Swiss-Prot record:
Role: Attaches a formyl group to the free amino group of methionyl-tRNA(fMet). The formyl group appears to play a dual role in the initiator identity of N-formylmethionyl-tRNA by promoting its recognition by IF2 and preventing the misappropriation of this tRNA by the elongation apparatus.
The organism of origin for this protein: Shewanella sp. (strain MR-7)
Binding site for (6S)-5,6,7,8-tetrahydrofolate: 112-115
Protein name: Methionyl-tRNA formyltransferase
An example Gene Ontology molecular-function term: methionyl-tRNA formyltransferase activity
Presence of keyword Protein biosynthesis: yes
Top-level taxon: Bacteria
Alphabetical list of HAMAP family matching this protein: Formyl_trans
InterPro entries assigned: Fmt, Formyl_trans_C, Formyl_trans_C_sf, Formyl_transf_N, Formyl_transf_N_sf, Formyl_transferase-like_C_sf, GART_AS, Met-tRNA-FMT_C
Family to which the UniProt record says this protein belongs: Belongs to the Fmt family.
Keyword Transferase in record: yes
Catalytic activity field: L-methionyl-tRNA(fMet) + (6R)-10-formyltetrahydrofolate = N-formyl-L-methionyl-tRNA(fMet) + (6S)-5,6,7,8-tetrahydrofolate + H(+)
Length: 318
């Protein structure tokens, strides 16, 4: 297969994993587009994206326009004369003129099985909804939000102990192989594009800190899914004794209870059992204000008086 001249567009670590795979391949990465350097850390020092750092280390030209809507930036991109543009978590909207510039158009690596979860947070929403599988879709981009024709899909089962952090890592490993496979198929003309079924599409909205508040009137199953979806950010939490307490890990209990939602059923080193709107949820790992995440056994050693049975956990949602 003749090597493709590729423009790569991406910003975070997830994207950098895919850029590394392209660098290691026989294709030519002729330019990298990434978001402008941003202030980061306590000193608010301008910091390059992981994609920029990787590109610079391999002497690949880097472009950082604030927008691709203006003609000078579009002409600059067209002058590169790329065969294809690969987009992975870039963060800028590509207008139609840019999508149509490369000979083979622009393709995107999306962290879900389309059209199930379009949008910014497909990994988190798959967990939040209790999906049994996720995966990676390589898609031909159009002007819509993740609405383009699907070129290739890979599948990944969602395990009971998966969180957004673990799924992110698994998909970051799965995506680059899928991308290289899709590029080979495009170059050889062996890929068949598949239209998305609009009836099956959902929008994966970004998570919010407000959404991470645990509402004990929900079922134990839904709360268990939310805790996994919101790990590592923004982390599920409840309010108790005037403090915000984060919850990092839970499991669904086999205990039955008709106590009011939010009531502590039992508290031991094995976990704190809390009544919900349907079933009982066991809290396994929590984080007190200003402290590191700890096992419930350690939490009870420090603050056992906060979590005595029949105590009702405070929650503004109640």
């Amino acid at each position: 297969m003749k090597p493709l001249n590729i423009i790569f567009a991406g910003t975070p670590d997830f994207a950098a994993r895919h850029l590394q795979a392209l660098i290691n391949s026989h294709h030519n990465v002729i330019a990298v587009y990434t978001q402008p350097d941003r202030p980061a850390g306590r000193g608010k020092k301008l910091t390059a994206s992981p994609v920029k750092e990787l590109a610079v280390s391999h002497d690949i030209p880097v472009y950082q326009p604030g927008s691709l809507r203006k003609e000078p930036a579009q002409q600059e991109l067209a002058a590169l004369n790329a065969d294809i543009m690969v987009v992975v978590a870039y963060g800028l909207i590509l207008p139609k003129v840019v999508l149509d510039t490369p000979r083979l158009g622009c393709i995107n690596v999306h962290g879900s099985i389309l059209p199930r979860w379009r949008g910014a947070a497909p990994i988190q929403r798959a967990l939040w909804a209790g999906d049994k599988e996720t995966g990676v879709t390589i898609m031909q981009m159009d002007v819509g939000l993740d609405t383009g024709d699907m070129l290739l899909k890979t599948y990944l089962p969602i395990e009971d102990d998966d969180t957004s952090a673990t799924l992110y890592e698994k998909l970051a490993q799965q995506g680059p192989d899928a991308l290289l496979q899709a590029l080979e198929g495009l170059a050889n003309g062996t890929l068949t594009a598949e239209k998305q079924d609009e009836a099956l599409a959902n929008y994966a909205e970004k998570l919010s800190k407000e959404e991470a508040r645990l509402d004990w009137s929900k079922s134990a199953t839904q709360l268990w899914q939310e805790v996994r979806a919101f790990n590592p950010w923004p982390v599920s939490y409840f309010e108790h004794q005037g403090n915000t307490i984060k919850v990092w890990q839970t499991q669904i209990s086999t205990t039955s209870s008709n106590a009011a939602p939010g009531t502590i059923i039992s508290a031991s080193k094995k976990g704190i059992e809390v009544a919900t709107g349907d079933g009982v949820l066991t809290l396994l790992s929590m984080q007190l204000p200003g402290k590191k995440p700890l096992s419930v056994a350690d939490i009870l050693n420090a603050r056992g008086d906060w979590f005595t049975p029949n105590t009702r956990l405070n929650n503004e949602a109640q």
